[in-house]
Every structure is written in structure tokens, then in C-alpha cells.
Amino acid sequence: MVNIILLIVSALIGLILGYALISIRLKSAKEAAELTLLNAEQEAVDIRGKAEVDAEHIKKTAKRESKANRKELLLKAKEEARKYREEIEQEFKSERQELKQLETRLAERSLTLDRKDENLSSKEKVLDSKEQSLTDKSKHIDERQLQVEKLEEEKKAELEKVAAMTIAEAREVILMETENKLTHEIATRIRDAERDIKDRTVKTAKDLLAQAMQRLAGEYVTEQTITSVHLPDDNMKGRIIGREGRNIRTLESLTGIDVIIDDTPEVVILSGFDPIRREIARMTLESLIADGRIHPARIEELVEKNRLEMDNRIREYGEAAAYEIGAPNLHPDLIKIMGRLQFRTSFGQNVLRHSVEVGKLAGILAGELGENVALARRAGFLHDMGKAIDREVEGSHVEIGMEFARKYKEHPVVVNTIASHHGDVEPDSVIAVLVAAADALSSARPGARNESMENYIKRLRDLEEIATSFDGVQNSFALQAGREIRIMVQPEKISDDQVVILSHKVREKIEHNLDYPGNIKVTVIREMRAVDYAK
């Protein structure tokens, strides 16, 4: 660019110098060059024009070259700037990567330090806890040491006192003191054990029994020892008695039932403790009344016929009960045995209906606990089958039931259930326990069974006498038909801790001395009153 400008300047200077030279020459040779002046001027003009054209051309060329050089320089500068920027960015990128790695290492180190700090804090807490524990133990040891020293002093004083006693007196004093000291601990342990057992079992047991009772609705007709037979008129009484009482004696001898004919209008009473015989007598007497032929031969014929009919009815009762309980493949002899329970009662409760109810309850409880429902229902259904034949075979109904269950190849769980439902042997399965619970639930619920008034009063009187036999008992009351005994104690003789022990002693004596269905609740009440008067 500078060279071009210098070239232009040089050209201009050359032109100026040439013009000056021509002017001088023209001036010096004015006279000689007038002819050529116009030519010279013209040449000068031409030269000037050409110089201007050349200068303009040179200027344009210089501008184009300058513009091209500027673009080239600009591109070169941009390329250099780009390369420099890339180098700078690469350096920044490397530095950022290093910074990032450094930050990561610092974060990891910080996390490690935090963990170490937490571990140190945790160890410090543990050490503080151990230190506190050691301090507490040290205090406890000091307290125990003081107690031991105090006890040693007391024992020393007691030994000094005992030294003047006989061996028997000293033993009695020591035993009394030991019992008094252990009374509180025994009562506390009993309360804790009872509370723990109640917390874990009462709610579950109540829920299970409530569900079982809600899902089963049983009905019973109270059984009696007498049966009334309605007569069309009172004249039939004489025909039943017969000449010289032959008819009534024949009926009584064949059935083993007392036929009572009194002043009750149009009624004959059949009395007997065997419901099957009483039912046969009823069927026979009703058949005689309907037939009208009443004489010893006809009575014998109808008694035999009704015995066969009774066998069929017994089998039908057994089949219906087995179908109701869902006991398939029951041996025909067992079906007949179970049918006979329709005519057996226990405390006024029909034994067959009781067996069906126990089977259903046991099945419900087994279902709630995930046991074999069908086996539980079968075991509950057969648990009292020995009652159908215990009058004909020696042994208790439990022993007879076990024998027949083994004879007819019943499941071992069924055999053990029959053996254990009254506590004669230990239950080997959960089903045996469930059947025992269902048996108690069915038989002990209010209204399920009846007792005679005399036995009822005697049982209540015995219950109250057992309670009042203990020292410190002020009064006792048998409540809820003998299912609860409420004991009022003298507060100056019985302490709060001794109340718990007294309730257990009363319970043990009741269990050893009384026979009763279900459970008896023992409640001991200690009441301390302080009365004063403001004057």
C-alpha cells in the first residue's frame, strides 16, 4: 500500500517536474517554440490526461489490491483468532476438568470426614451411655451395699433376739418374716403373669368365640323324665288299667316305664329315666288308644313293633345328624350309636343336638385357626358318643367312646379328642383343644343345661362356705347362678398383695372340692374406709 502511494506521489512529482521543465523551456525559447507551443501544450494536456488516467487506474488498482489484501489480512486474522480461541478454550476445558476432579475429590474427602465425625459422635454417645450406666451401677451397688449393711444390722438385732428363743420359735419367726417379704414379690409376679396372659389371649379368644357363636344358632327343647299322653276321654283310663291291672302291668314290665294314672283329666303320665323306653311306651300307648284293642297280647305285639320302629328312627336320627355335621363314610354302627343320643340328656340338654353343636363350633374355630375343618367337625360330633352305651358297658363314657372309635378305625385325632375332652389325658392336637373349648361353650352357656333346685342351692352354699373358710374373709356372695363368687375381706388383716394370693387359694380349693360345669370367677374385694367428723 505504501509502495503504491509512493509510486503515485513519484509519478505526480515527475509530472510536476516535467511541467516545470517544459515551462522553463517554453519561457527560454518562447520565441523559438511558439510554433510548437500549441503542440507542447496539447502534448502536456495529453500527458496530463494520460497521467490522470494512469493515476486513476493506478489508484483503482491500488484500492483493489488494498481491498484484497485487507480481506486476506482479515481472513488471516480471523483464522489466527479462531485458533487462539480454540487454544484458550482447550486450556479452559482442561482447567475445568481438573477443577471438577478436584471438587469430586474434595466432596469425597468431605463425606469421609463426615462419616468419621458421625462414627466419633456415635462412639462418644456409647461411651457416655456406658459411663452413665457405670455411674448408675455404681450408685446401685452403693445403695445395695447400704441395704446389705442395714440388713446385717437388722439380722444381728434379730439374732440377738432369737438367741433367747427355742429352735422352733426361731424357725417360725424366720419363716413368717420370709413369707411376709416374699408376699409382695409373689403377688407382683402373679399380677404380671396374669396381665401378660390376658393381653395375649383374651382378645383373640373373645373374637374367636364371638365369631363362632354368631355363626351358629342352636335350639334345644328341655328334656324331662316324664311324658304325658292325651286321652280322648277318662273312660280310657280303665281300659288301660285292664282287669285287675293286667294291661298296665304288662306295659310296665315290657317297657320298664312307670304308667301313672291319677286324677288329672284325660292324661296318662309315663315316668322313666330311659328316654328310649319312655318313647317306646308312648308310641305303644298311643297305638293302643287309636286301635281300641287293649289287652296283654296286643300290648306285646305293639311293643315289639315299636321297638323295631324305634331302631329305624334311631338310625334316621343318626343319619340326619351325620349329614348335618358333614361326616361322610361314618360306620353304620356309629350312625346308630349317635342316633341313640337323641334320647339322651345331660343336665336337661339333648346330647345329640349338643354333639352337633360342638361339631359345628369346633369346625368354625378350626377354620379361623387354619386347621382341618372336616376333621374338627367329625371329632366334635363323636366326642360324646360313649354316652349312648355307657349304661350297657362298664366304664366312663370317655373310655367307652375311645374303645368304639378305635374299633371302627376312626382317625387318631378323633380318638385323642374323645379321650381328652374332659381332661383325662393330654390333648395331642389343636383340634382336641378346640373340641374341648366348643364342648365347654355349648354346655356352659346360659340356658343350655338345667340342674335340680336342691343341687343348685347346695352348690351355691358350698361355694360360699369355701370362700369364708379363709382367715380375713368378712363376707362372700355367690352370684350369676354360681358362676362368680365375690369375697369381701377385712382390710386390717388382708393387704393388697395378699388379695391376689387369696384369690388363687380360693380358686385352687374350689377346683379340688367342687364339681361344676364351666368356669367360676373368683373376685376378692378389699375396701378401706376412713371416716371422721368435723365438729
Curated annotation (Swiss-Prot):
Q: Which UniProt keywords apply?
A: Cell membrane, Endonuclease, Hydrolase, Membrane, Nuclease, RNA-binding, Transmembrane, Transmembrane helix
What are the GO MF terms of this UniProt record? RNA binding; RNA endonuclease activity
What protein am I looking at? Answer: Ribonuclease Y
**EC id:** 3.1.-.-
**What is one GO biological process annotated to this record?**
mRNA catabolic process
InterPro entries per the record?
HD/PDEase_dom, HD_domain, HDIG_dom, KH_dom, KH_dom_type_1, KH_dom_type_1_sf, Ribonuclease_Y, RNase_Y_N
Q: Report how it sits in the membrane.
A: Single-pass membrane protein
Q: Which organism is it from?
A: Streptococcus pyogenes serotype M2 (strain MGAS10270)
SMART domains xrefs: HDc (SM00471), KH (SM00322)
* Family (UniProt): Belongs to the RNase Y family.
Would the keyword RNA-binding turn up in this protein's UniProt record? yes
Query: Which Pfam families does this one have?
Result: HD, KH_1, RNase_Y_N
Q: Which domain of life is it from?
A: Bacteria
Please indicate if the UniProt record lists Transmembrane as a keyword.
Answer: yes
Query: Which NCBIfam families does the UniProt record give?
Result: HDIG, PRK00106.1, RNase_Y
Q: Name the job this protein performs.
A: Endoribonuclease that initiates mRNA decay.
The residue ranges of the KH domain are 225-285
Gene responsible for this protein: rny
Q: Where in the cell is it found?
A: Cell membrane
Main subcellular location of this protein, as a coarse class: membrane
